[in-house]
């Protein structure tokens, strides 16, 4: 009996050590947990789009002096025929303001494009909201917009700062539908150029940062993205302001950036498109939302195939693979390229060729003036 007791006492620390190690092994941060799927299914890693495409949503931040030969080499690998630089005026420090006030920036960028690859790059211009509300702001902004269009701008890009960060000369938030901007939207319509407008951010950025928030990891790793209803305004308020602009200016073509942040609510987005035939959407930075609802997303692309454009946003060539795979293949259960954006797995939509052609280039050729169509099939 005594020997048995001694043996058991000897085993206690061993068992304690073992269970302690096991408990430690079972604890890890969410960022660390990255299981490898054991699912054996077909996989198609597409490094090149099936058809030449127009990237309607891209940013290059040094276009006046950038080596465009190097850039086109990377574009050719992807089968990107035309890149649209939305940052036509850059974002430079002018008289103490980081803004788009430098009128020479766009001119120099256009000169670089014309001298080297005039058929491969287009640019949208931007307007400065510095001194907004002061007398003469509207006339000055309209004159600069017309000058840039005369110099080759194919559209106007509005950053998300409108409605969120920009303030007028009295220090008040500038709503997206501020009536003092009506002349800008109307001018774009008369010039026959589209307005690509980014309003708000993903709605989860406004939700409580708790265990129920799908964007918890993104907010943890990027805390500056967290929003509050009173700072600067609620998500619903900003989006409704944007939609009010769409309805009020039906002779102007608008492209809602990032699917209007409604890729997770395609029914609501469909209602908006039905109501506003002047509105288009593009898929930059929301492909993960589409990839987790392949059947509904495919139905949406089929129904609204004439209203969707291809866009990527950040220039990271290796990430285009994800877009091609979601749009073109029927692959199952594959990861997104940034866990903090989407920790879930995705599925391909396997879009038919005619829908792919419209998304990749036909729709952009139709609504953006003066593009070279020679690189695209019929």
Language-model features, listed with the residues they occupy:
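Hydrophobic faces of well-ordered beta-strands that scaffold small-molecule active sites
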Residues: 54-58, 82-85, 122-125, 156-158, ...
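An N-terminally biased module of ancient metal coordination in phosphate/nucleic-acid-related enzymes
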Residues: 26-119
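Acidic-and-aromatic substrate-binding clefts and catalytic sites of carbohydrate-active enzymes
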Residues: 59-68, 90-105, 130-139, 166, ...
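H/E-rich (His + Asp/Glu) clusters that bind or coordinate divalent metals
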Residues: 64-65, 72, 230, 235-378
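Acidic (Asp/Glu)-rich catalytic clusters
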Residues: 44-48, 71-79, 107-120, 143-153, ...
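Bacterial N-terminal signal peptides that target proteins for export
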Residues: 1-10
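Active-site gating loops and adjacent loop-to-helix segments of metal-dependent hydrolytic enzymes
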Residues: 31, 50, 167, 203-229, ...
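Active-site gating/metal-coordination segments in enzymes
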Residues: 100-225
